[in-house]
Amino acid sequence: MESKALLLLALSVCLQSLTVSRGGLVAADRITGGKDFRDIESKFALRTPEDTAEDTCHLIPGVTESVANCHFNHSSKTFVVIHGWTVTGMYESWVPKLVAALYKREPDSNVIVVDWLSRAQQHYPVSAGYTKLVGQDVAKFMNWMADEFNYPLGNVHLLGYSLGAHAAGIAGSLTNKKVNRITGLDPAGPNFEYAEAPSRLSPDDADFVDVLHTFTRGSPGRSIGIQKPVGHVDIYPNGGTFQPGCNIGEALRVIAERGLGDVDQLVKCSHERSVHLFIDSLLNEENPSKAYRCNSKEAFEKGLCLSCRKNRCNNMGYEINKVRAKRSSKMYLKTRSQMPYKVFHYQVKIHFSGTESNTYTNQAFEISLYGTVAESENIPFTLPEVSTNKTYSFLLYTEVDIGELLMLKLKWISDSYFSWSNWWSSPGFDIGKIRVKAGETQKKVIFCSREKMSYLQKGKSPVIFVKCHDKSLNRKSG
């Protein structure tokens, strides 16, 4: 009899040891409604506005009381933040910044951070493969919230960075009903550039998918960020290849000043810029950055795409207009090197006239814009070619809002090297009018020379043009 009691006690201890899971929770409690949630390895921390940096309370799939214990707000929208690959096995510094910005913009919302750090810390190809399992974990969690608490998935916005963007896409493809929105923050390129839609972020994964591409430098499949469009709207700030303030010269300067401690930050500077651009859109609600639809970044650099007709422009970030085109819309914009990132875009068209036929290559100019609010002086630009009796279009941007344009100055910069021909006489062109279109306001302005024609001479004083009246201003904008 005594041996039988000892056997029962041993079996009880054994069963208890088998059913206790991480954090002291009984794994059997994670089997509800016939569904087993014990295979979910990812953790779901509901962070608070008071403590955006710590995972103090976890929502545990299958454990209904965890939702009440964490004070989940069932009547508000929910943001789910999914991090990417990590070298350190720790959250990166952008995570609490994004959480804080989300709460500042939506104080009553729920901001959940998905912890898949143990899987994300592996060699990149291994971690890339784990995105499928992480996506499955997130989908099971969201389906449980919908089934158990009748929480509408239409209130859910997934935000995934790098590998996390693809995990978000996989999650969205597996939920019983579509989530409202997925934002891909520079989705990872290697292992995903040529992947089929079910294995990566795609437009089918949510009611609306918007993507920021910030580090696509390199050949397809080898660039850190994915190059091809994978959403309803894909935005490529500064062409998407590299971001201002993230150059090699800046890296060397920081290393000289601070040592090697910040090298990893500089390497991922452009990649992580996607997150900070989105944070900027949350914090600067009144001044969203505007992006413009264009067939190529080359056409955008010529200023040919600053139209807002038929949804050709859109806000970048949180306040984006949810335009679901039949095919993905590639959009471009310029930004500053630091927050606030917004700039003001202008298309400038100049016709170079003259009696002699001349062509010059790679010519440097400066233009100064003067408006009702401020001015932006000595903006440099280079034209690959300047020929007599041809019109050239190019893109300019200012970091300040100068208001309505009133006047501009144009200067042709002399070559840095000495030339006898330039010593005796420098080339020049006649310019009568300069046409400018402001992207943010869509206003067109024509500037005229004070004379019938102004002679712009290389290396000489700038030429002044003032706002003039022209019947063509009344034509419908294109």
Swiss-Prot record:
The protein's name in its UniProt record: Lipoprotein lipase
Cellular localisation: Cell membrane; Secreted; Secreted, Extracellular space, Extracellular matrix
Lipid metabolism in keyword set: yes
Top-level taxon of the source organism: Eukaryota
A GO MF label: apolipoprotein binding
Tissue distribution: Detected in milk (at protein level).
Catalytic activity annotation: a triacylglycerol + H2O = a diacylglycerol + a fatty acid + H(+); a 1,2-diacyl-sn-glycero-3-phosphocholine + H2O = a 2-acyl-sn-glycero-3-phosphocholine + a fatty acid + H(+); 1,2,3-tri-(9Z-octadecenoyl)-glycerol + H2O = di-(9Z)-octadecenoylglycerol + (9Z)-octadecenoate + H(+); 1,2-di-(9Z-octadecenoyl)-sn-glycero-3-phosphocholine + H2O = (9Z-octadecenoyl)-sn-glycero-3-phosphocholine + (9Z)-octadecenoate + H(+)
One GO term describing the cellular component: chylomicron
Sequence positions bearing 3'-nitrotyrosine: 124, 194, 346
Regulation: The apolipoprotein APOC2 acts as a coactivator of LPL activity. Ca(2+) binding promotes protein stability and formation of the active homodimer. Interaction with GPIHBP1 protects LPL against inactivation by ANGPTL4.
Function: Key enzyme in triglyceride metabolism. Catalyzes the hydrolysis of triglycerides from circulating chylomicrons and very low density lipoproteins (VLDL), and thereby plays an important role in lipid clearance from the blood stream, lipid utilization and storage. Although it has both phospholipase and triglyceride lipase activities it is primarily a triglyceride lipase with low but detectable phospholipase activity. Mediates margination of triglyceride-rich lipoprotein particles in capillaries.
Region ranges (Interaction with GPIHBP1): 35-56, 446-470
Covalent S-S links between cysteines: 57-70, 246-269, 294-313, 305-308, 448-468
Chain spans, region Important for interaction with lipoprotein particles: 420-424
Enzyme class: hydrolase
Region Important for heparin binding, annotated ranges: 433-437
Organism, as annotated: Bos taurus (Bovine)
Endpoints of the signal sequence: 1-28
Protein modification: Tyrosine nitration after lipopolysaccharide (LPS) challenge down-regulates the lipase activity.
Main location as per UniProt: membrane
Pfam families (alphabetical): Lipase, PLAT
Domain PLAT residues, every copy: 344-467
Transit peptide keyword on record: no
EC number: 3.1.1.34, 3.1.1.32
Entry annotation: catalytic residues: 162, 186, 271
